[in-house]
């Protein structure tokens, strides 16, 4: 008897796919003011605070906006890049989008941003996952783990809050 167990080795689970083991990037910040104001600041006035110099496709001088069911960056020469497609829009509480700035929808990840009232104003919780959709899942996740805090710090300051540590 080669095996003490009643099942064969073929029935054992295989190795875990490294992409499936990548954790979501979750960031939470608090801004002063009511939920509706925070939602509008994030979605209607993105062009005023988004750090396009470091977190954009075309860099300074471009313009980012939520346009119908898309998130779009427009360069000063008129070129456009679709950052994502919104598939769940629940103002002023949340939105969900496929997310692919600088690449195509084929390589998209998943982004959900939710807003809720807290004693100090509004809490924004960003949940970014779906790394298996990215061309290079581990590198994409690592870049967003660094990038989202920078982006959200700019949003907090735009909304009148103190810079996050």
Residue spans of the language-model regions?
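Amphipathic alpha-helical segments
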Residues: 32-49
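Short, hydrophobic/aromatic-enriched beta-strand segments in well-ordered soluble domains
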Residues: 29, 126-129
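Ser/Thr-centric signal marking residues that sit
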Residues: 43-46, 109, 122
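Hydrophobic pocket/interface hotspot
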Residues: 38-42, 71, 86, 95-97, ...
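Hydrophobic-ligand binding "helix-grip"
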Residues: 2-4, 63, 76-120, 129-132
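Short acidic N-proximal helix/loop "leader" segments that mark the beginning
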Residues: 1-26
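Short beta-edge strand/loop motif at the mouth of beta-sheet-based domains
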Residues: 26-27, 44-83, 94
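A conserved amphipathic terminal alpha-helix motif
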Residues: 2-10, 130-165
């Amino acid at each position: 008897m080669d095996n003490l167990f009643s099942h064969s080795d073929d029935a054992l689970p295989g190795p875990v796919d490294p992409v499936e083991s990548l954790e979501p990037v979750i960031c939470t910040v608090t801004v002063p003011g009511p939920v509706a104001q925070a939602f509008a600041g994030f979605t209607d006035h993105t062009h005023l605070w988004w750090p396009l110099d470091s977190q954009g496709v075309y860099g300074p001088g471009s313009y980012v906006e939520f346009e119908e069911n898309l998130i779009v960056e427009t360069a000063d020469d008129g070129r456009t890049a679709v950052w994502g497609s919104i598939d769940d829009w629940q103002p002023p509480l949340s939105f969900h989008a496929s997310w692919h700035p600088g690449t195509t929808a084929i390589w998209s990840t998943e982004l959900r941003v939710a807003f809720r009232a807290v004693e100090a104003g509004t809490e924004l919780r960003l949940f970014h996952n779906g790394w298996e959709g990215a061309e290079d899942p581990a590198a994409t996740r690592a870049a967003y783990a660094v990038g989202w805090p920078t982006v959200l710090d700019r949003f907090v300051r735009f909304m009148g809050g103190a810079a996050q540590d």
